[in-house]
């Protein structure tokens, strides 16, 4: 797995380089302190991941990531920065992770393990666009200006709140900066169903289906004390999905 480091502080660059070599099998093929130099390098070289600071000369890390996102081969991007206010932008760019300085060594090592696993899955998957959700498929969620790499199967349901979407797992909740239609489009339709204009539910997390008023249903979920409604307009499709 080939990676580059983009960091204009020499000591920070050296520390990150040491951690990568010490705790992973990744090959560092370049270190840079200037955004434009990175773009020039990537025009002729392919890498699998980029560890990226934001406050760098010539072209800041966010703009650099926006340019890289247009490439046919999109490397994983891990932001490592002191600027916490760019976490939402990083999510929109589908960054793999967003780590704030100063960081704990354990935070870096945990990220490296997940990154190598994601890369291995990318290499071995012959059907990357398949609708079947594997146990280790993940999605990036935002919490407290941090990106949390979350297994898709951990999501129980999502609920619309105006232009935002609240996402719920068994123990956590997340606020996503997008409407529920956009968020649901990121989920595999074989496992998630838009049961109501305000709700999307993980079909695998349904514990009980109770008939409700006007031929609708209430869904009770495993492990959560919460009921998700099925609207009248979605009843027919829901019955077909659940073989009712």
UniProtKB/Swiss-Prot annotation:
Cellular component terms per the entry's GO annotation: cytosol; protein-DNA complex
InterPro entries named in the record: CheY-like_superfamily, LytR-like, LytTR_DNA-bd_dom, Sig_transdc_resp-reg_receiver
Documented effect of changing residue 53 to N: Prevents yhjX induction
Domain (HTH LytTR-type) ranges: 139-244
Pfam family, one: Response_reg
Localisation per UniProt entry: Cytoplasm
The protein's name in its UniProt record: Transcriptional regulatory protein YpdB
Main location: cytoplasm
Keyword annotations of the record: Cytoplasm, DNA-binding, Phosphoprotein, Transcription, Transcription regulation, Two-component regulatory system
SUPFAM superfamilies named among the record's database cross-references: CheY-like
Organism, as annotated: Escherichia coli (strain K12)
Domain Response regulatory: 2-116
Modification type 4-aspartylphosphate: residues: 53
Described purpose of this protein according to its UniProt entry: Member of the two-component regulatory system YpdA/YpdB, which is part of a nutrient-sensing regulatory network composed of YpdA/YpdB, the high-affinity pyruvate signaling system BtsS/BtsR and their respective target proteins, YhjX and BtsT. YpdB regulates expression of yhjX by binding to its promoter region. Activation of the YpdA/YpdB signaling cascade also promotes BtsS/BtsR-mediated btsT expression.
């Amino acid at each position: 797995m080939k990676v580059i480091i983009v960091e204009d502080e020499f000591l920070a660059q050296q520390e990150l380089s040491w951690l990568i070599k010490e705790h992973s099998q990744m090959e560092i093929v370049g270190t840079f302190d200037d955004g434009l130099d990175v773009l020039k390098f990537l025009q002729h070289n392919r890498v699998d991941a980029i560890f990226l600071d934001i406050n760098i000369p010539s072209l800041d890390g966010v703009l650099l990531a926006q340019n890289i996102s247009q490439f046919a081969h999109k490397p994983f991007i891990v932001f490592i920065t002191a600027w916490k206010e760019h976490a939402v932008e990083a999510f929109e760019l589908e960054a793999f992770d967003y780590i704030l300085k100063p960081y704990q060594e354990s935070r870096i090592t945990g990220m490296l393990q997940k990154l190598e696993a994601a890369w291995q899955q990318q290499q071995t998957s012959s059907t990357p666009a398949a609708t079947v959700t594997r146990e280790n498929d993940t999605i990036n969620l935002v919490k407290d200006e941090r990106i949390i790499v979350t297994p898709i199967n951990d999501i129980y349901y999502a609920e619309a709140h105006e232009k935002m979407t609240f996402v719920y797992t068994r123990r956590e909740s997340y606020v996503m900066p997008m409407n529920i239609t956009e968020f649901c489009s990121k989920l595999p339709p074989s496992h998630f169903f838009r049961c109501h204009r305000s709700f999307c539910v993980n079909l695998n997390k349904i514990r009980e289906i109770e008939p409700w008023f006007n031929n609708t249903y209430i869904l009770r979920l495993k492990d959560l004390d919460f009921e998700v409604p099925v609207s009248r307009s979605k009843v027919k499709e829901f019955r077909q999905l659940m073989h009712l």
